[in-house]
Regions:
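Soluble non-transmembrane domains of integral membrane proteins
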Residues: 114-337
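Cytoplasmic C-terminal tails of single-pass
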Residues: 367-374
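Short, Lys/Arg-rich N-terminal segment immediately upstream of the first membrane anchor
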Residues: 1-11, 51-56, 83
C-alpha cells in the first residue's frame, strides 16, 4: 500500500501531466483553424481519449486533469514532508492548486451556455442552449393542456430506443446528424417513410466551425404504435412545420430544438438602447434596462456590454440585438458556472502560500549573503 501511495503521489506525475496539457493546448489551438472552437474543445479537452491522426489513442484533457487531481490529492494527504511548519507555504500552494482543479472540474461538468431573447415590453425565463438539442414530443389531444415529453441529446444516439410512460409507442433513433439540410427527393420514397421524409431526405453536412450555426437533425422509427403511424420520420432544427402523427387516437407533435432551461425568475425588457458609430450603421455599444422579477417582486437593473447581471449562479451578458418590424429585441448570453469563484479563491490561497514560503526563505538568504560577504 505504501508503495502505491508513493507512486501515485510522485511529483513526477504532476510534471508529466503539465507537459502533456501543454501539448494538448498546442494541438487544440492549431485544430481550431480547421474544425472550430467547440469541436476542438470536445476533441482535445473534454474527451477522455484523444485520437491522434485518427489512429493513436492518447489521454484527453479530462483524463489528464483527473490524473493531476488524484496526484495532488495524494501529495497533500500523504506526503509527510509537506506537513511540517517549514513547508507550510508549499502545502498551502498545493491546496490552492487542488481547489483550482476542483473548480475546473465543476465548470467542465456542470456549466452551461445559452442565450435569452427578449422583445421590448416582454419577459422571459427561458434559456436556449448554444450547443445541446432535445427531442420534444407534445401530446396536443387535450385542448386545454399540452403534455410535453423531452429527451436530451445524449440519448439521441444511433440505435437507442426511447420510451416513456407518457407515450404509448417506442422511438428508435436511426441516425443523429450534427449538421444537415433537407433535400427534395428525386424519386418516390418507400411506403415505410412518413411525414416530411415522404418528399424530402436529410443530407449530412460537414459541421460548421461555429457550433451554434449547425443545424442538427434526426431520423427515427416509430414502433409498437399498433397503427398505420409506424414508420420512419425525420426532423431538423428550425423546421418551420412540426412533424405530426395520430397514434392510438392521440395527436402528437415532434420537434427538435435547442435544449431549454427554465429559470426560477424572469427578466423583463423595459428599454433597449444602442449607440451607433458616427456615419455608419454599426453599433458602438448597446444596453438593456430590465426588470429582474422573482416571487412577483421586480428589481430594475441595467445590463451593459461590460457590466453583466449576476443572479443565482447565472451571469447575463449583453450579447447582441435583433431589429424587426415589430420592434427591437435584446439577446442576452446566459452562463451558468458552478466553479466561477474557485479561480479567485485558489489564486488568493496560492498567493498566500507563495508569500509565506518566501518569508520563510528570507532568513536563510540573509545568512547566506552574510557568509559570502565575510
Amino acid at each position: 500500500m505504501k508503495q502505491i501511495i508513493k507512486i501515485v503521489s510522485s511529483p513526477k506525475i504532476f510534471v508529466y501531466t503539465i507537459i502533456w496539457l501543454m501539448v494538448l493546448v498546442v494541438l487544440g489551438t492549431l485544430a481550431q483553424r480547421d474544425i472550430g472552437l467547440y469541436a476542438s474543445q470536445q476533441k482535445y479537452f473534454s474527451a477522455n481519449i484523444t485520437w491522434l491522426g485518427g489512429i493513436i489513442p492518447v489521454p484527453g484533457g479530462r483524463i489528464t486533469m483527473i490524473i493531476m487531481l488524484v496526484n495532488l490529492t495524494f501529495m497533500v494527504l500523504f506526503k509527510q514532508n509537506l506537513w511540517k511548519i517549514k513547508k507550510i507555504g508549499v502545502l498551502i500552494m498545493h491546496i490552492g492548486a487542488l481547489l483550482l482543479l476542483i473548480g475546473g472540474g465543476l465548470t467542465a461538468i456542470f456549466s452551461s451556455e445559452g442565450n435569452m431573447v427578449i422583445e421590448e415590453g416582454a419577459q422571459s425565463n427561458r434559456v436556449d442552449d448554444y450547443h445541446d438539442t432535445e427531442l420534444t414530443i407534445i401530446n396536443t389531444s387535450n385542448e386545454n393542456l399540452d403534455k410535453y415529453t423531452v429527451f436530451d441529446q445524449p440519448i439521441l444516439g444511433k440505435g437507442n430506443i426511447l420510451s416513456h410512460e407518457n407515450l404509448n409507442f417506442n422511438i428508435e433513433i436511426i441516425s443523429y446528424l450534427r449538421n444537415c439540410e433537407p433535400l427534395k427527393r428525386t424519386a418516390p420514397a418507400g411506403i415505410h417513410y412518413k411525414g416530411m421524409l415522404k418528399n424530402f431526405m436529410l443530407r449530412s453536412l460537414r459541421p460548421e466551425k461555429e457550433n451554434s450555426r449547425n443545424r442538427p437533425g434526426i431520423t427515427y422509427r416509430i414502433t409498437n404504435s399498433e397503427s398505420s403511424s409506424d414508420g420512419i420520420y425525420g426532423l431538423f432544427l428550425g423546421q418551420s412545420v412540426p412533424q405530426t402523427a395520430v397514434i392510438n387516437n392521440q395527436n402528437y407533435e415532434f420537434i427538435i430544438r435547442r435544449k431549454r432551461t427554465y429559470l426560477p425568475f424572469a427578466i423583463e425588457l423595459l428599454d433597449f438602447k444602442k449607440v451607433m458609430h458616427s456615419g455608419t450603421g454599426i453599433a458602438k455599444s448597446y444596453s438593456s434596462e430590465v426588470n429582474l422579477i422573482e416571487n412577483g417582486i421586480p428589481r430594475r437593473v441595467l445590463i451593459e456590454m461590460n457590466e453583466p447581471l449576476r443572479h443565482k449562479g447565472y451571469t447575463f451578458f449583453q450579447s447582441s440585438f435583433i431589429e424587426g418590424p415589430e420592434g427591437e429585441a435584446t439577446v442576452l448570453a446566459a452562463v451558468k458556472n458552478y466553479g466561477r469563484s474557485f479561480p479567485y479563491i485558489s489564486s488568493i490561497i496560492m498567493s498566500i502560500g507563495l508569500l509565506l514560503h518566501l518569508l520563510k526563505s528570507i532568513p536563510k538568504l540573509l545568512k547566506k549573503n552574510l557568509r559570502v560577504a565575510d
